């Protein structure tokens, strides 16, 4: 399972080179090693990617037939790595599968990600930072559900295929913020008025 990647969109805008090194060159190095290893082993490579490769989905959900339209250096680096893996399947016949997952959330997630950042700010009675008007809609999946899907794909997936993984739970950033505030109020005392900053 290749879960290694630089993933923060804003950081990819500030320093795209790091994302190219990790997400493209790193995957190339992995593929070169796996190309030799797979000749002696019955292993398969599961390359974990993101639904960010599809760009902005204005309505509905993305599917495996959607064209790639990355809208950040992060998304572009993941799209490039997906194509690189796919090319190694076709050219060198390596046993690999590509997955594109929606936004994960769960325990021990990096604090710069949206849900942990919002929870931290709620707990510390700080304003909740929301980009634009908070209408950006994303699909969210609990990390354990993502892992279960990866295991199914590992066991039953078809070599060379792309599989989207999601939850069917689309929420915009404003909805996520309000939901977290409501849940927090049920569990413990939070500040009287938590501000949402746009």
Question: Which ranges hold each PLM region?
Answer:
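N-terminal Rossmann-like NAD(P)+-binding domain of SDR-like oxidoreductases, especially those catalyzing
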Residues: 1-104, 124, 144, 173, ...
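Residue-level signature of the cytosolic catalytic core of signaling kinases
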Residues: 107-111, 169
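C-terminal substrate-binding subdomain of Rossmann-fold SDR/epimerase-dehydratase oxidoreductases
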Residues: 116, 122-198
